UniProtKB/Swiss-Prot annotation:
SUPFAM superfamilies: Kelch motif (SSF117281), POZ domain (SSF54695). Kelch repeats lie at residues 280-326, 328-374, 376-423, 424-471, 473-512. PROSITE patterns: BTB. The keyword Cytoplasm does not apply. The keyword DNA damage does not apply. Belongs to the poxviruses Kelch family. Keywords: Kelch repeat, Repeat. Residues 16-82 form the BTB domain. This is Kelch repeat protein M-T8. It comes from Myxoma virus (strain Lausanne).
Amino acid sequence: MMSYPLYKLFLKGKLCDVEIVAEGKSIRAHRLVLSAYSKYFYNLFNGNFLEKNVDVIDLEADYKTVFDVIYYMYTESIELHKGNTESIFSLVHYLQIKPLIKKCIYEFNSIVNEENCIRLFKFAELYDLSELKRRARWLMPSLVMNEKDRLREMSLDDLSLMLVQIRNTVDRSIALSAITEWIQTNVRERRRHAVHLATCLGDVPGTASSRAVYKHYMSELRIRVTEFQPAYHNCVVYLGGSMKGRVTALDPETGKSVVLSTWWPEERWECFTAVCMNDVLYFAGGKLDAVPTRQVLSYDVKANTWSRQPNLSEFRSDAAAYAIGGCIYIIGGYDANDRPTNTTLYWRPGYDRWYRGPTLVEAVAETSAVCYKNEIWVLGGRIHRDGVPDVTDVVQKLSGGTWTKVNELSVPKASVTAIVYKERLYCVGGLVDRYAPTNEVIRYRDDTNEWEYVGSTKIERGGAVGCVYNDELYVFGGTDTFTSERYNGVIWKRANDVSCHFATMNAAYATYLEL
C-alpha cells in the first residue's frame, strides 16, 4: 500500500501537480503516484508527448470509475462487483494498470452467470479475455435449459452468437430447443429468421424456406418412445445413513431400502475412498478421529461378512478409486500433510501389500475415476497452485501404463460424478469456484475430443454417488442434498430421496440381491 501521508495529501489536494477530469469533474493527484501504477501515465509524463507538461488530462470514463481507480493507486484497495467491474476494467486496460487488470479478471470469473454470460462473452472478445470467454461460453447452454424467459427475450444477434459458440459443444437437441423456443415466442415475426439461425447452427438449408426449416426442427425434436426394457437389477448398494456408515441396498423405483450391515469401527471415519469389485465393497484410507489412517476394510455383500485387508502403503484421504482387471487402483488424494499427491497405488485380492503405480500428470485430490474404453480416466479435482488450494479442469487417463492428459473439462471443478452410460462418458455436477455445486451435465465426444453440454440435473450437486440402474443413469445425494435423480438419455427426473454417507469418496453399484 502507498504510504499514508501521500494518501492524506491526495485527500486534501496538497502538492498535487496534475488534474484528471471526467464528466466535467476534476480530481487532483500526483504525477509520481500515477506513474508508479499506470504505464500509460508513466509514458505520458516521461515521453516526448505534447501532453507531457499539460496540467489537465481528460479521460473518457464516468467520474466514479475514474475516482475509484485513482483511489486504488493510492491505497491498493478497490471494491469490485458485477455493477462496476466492466467499467473499471475498460479504464485500467486503457491506463495499463496490470495489478488491477488481474484483479478484474479474477472478479469476472466469479460474477459471470447465466444472466450476463452473453454480454460478458462479447466483452471478453473485445479485450481477448480467453478464460472469461470460456466460462461465459460454458454457461450459454445452461441459459437455454434453465432461463427460458431470458431466452425468449434474447435479440436475434445474441441468439445467433450463442448458437455459433455452442453448436459444437452441446447435444444437438439443446441447440434446436433454443431456436424453436425463441421462434415460438412470436412465430409470425420470428419464423422468417429460421434459415439464418440454421446457418448459425452449422446446417446448410439450401433453398429451403424458413417455414420448412422451422417445421423440420420441430419434427426433429419429437421424442421417440423407446421399447420397454426388462429389469435385470433390483437394487443399488451404497454406503448410506449420513455419517453412520451403513451399507444400504436401495430400490430406486420404490424408495425402499434395507440396511445390510453397519461397519465395525467405533471411531469417526471420514475422507476414505469406497470402491466396488465383484459384489465386495472396499473402504480405504481416510481419517479416523481426524488422524490419517492407512487401513483398508472390505464388505462382501452376498456373504454379509467384513474383513481387514493389507494397509495402504501410504496415507491417503479423499482419493479416487476404480476396479478393473481384478485390480483396485487408488488414485491421487491428500497425503498425511493434506497436500494433493500424484501417486497411484494398486492391489488385487491375494496380494499381501499395495504397490506403487504410474505417476499422475498432475497431483490431485477429490477427483472422480471411471473406466472408459478400457482405460481409467480421472476428471477434475482439487490441486495446490503456487501453494494455494484451487480446482482444476485437467482430465487424465491411464493408457499403456502411463498417465496422459485429455482435453480439459468445460470449467475447473472437483467432486464430479463420472459415469459411462450407453457407451458414452458423462460428467455430472461437481463443485466449481472452490465449493459451489453445479447442475451441469457434460458428455465426451470421441470424434472431436471435446466435452459437450447435454443438460442439467434438477438439483445442483457435488460429490454425488452415481451408477447405471436398469438402463437409466442415477445420481444420489451430494453436497447439502438427500435428493436423487434419474436420466434416460433425454431428460432428468426426480427420484426418491436417499441418505448417502457424506465427507467421503463414496461409491455405488447396481446388482440383484435376494432381500
